Amino acid sequence: MIAPPNTYAQWAALLTTFVAGTADEEAVHAMRAGTLVWQSGVAERFTQRLLDALNTRIQKDGDTFSRDLARASAEQDTIAALLAQRRRFRTLYAAADLPALPAATRKETIAAVQTAADRTQESLEASAKTDRTGRMSALVRSHRVNVLETEAFS
């Protein structure tokens, strides 16, 4: 069990754990339960650190997704890759939607994750258009990676 962070140093350590991706569920639960005194200097540094962590995870998770899709040899493998990526994006969404953040900052961090998910979905749909059978397009539309709002981490 990871303790909820209360200081900038504790948040920094937790964000390092989050970026590593080794204990996502515990890390996100701790992040969502954490607090931070929102004062000048700390606020800007923390926001940048959180956005950097989210962007790093978006990149790492995107690389994992690309590998999963490249290895997919059957339809069920493709579906599994799409659903796994949606789960990863939902984890990032939960990490961006922190109760400790002021509304404007929260909106900014959520938007960063949603934009990445939307771009991924758009890219998938564009790539699927080259499939003459239309099956890939149907799979990509049926198993969207950008449907992120969830109560999983509440």
Go through each PLM region and give its residues:
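Long, low-complexity or tandemly repetitive, helically biased scaffold regions used
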Residues: T35-R144, E151-A152
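Leu/Val/Ala/Ile-rich N-terminal alpha-helices, chiefly Sec-type signal peptides and the beginnings
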Residues: M1-A43
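Short intrinsically disordered terminal tails
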Residues: M1-I2, E151-S154
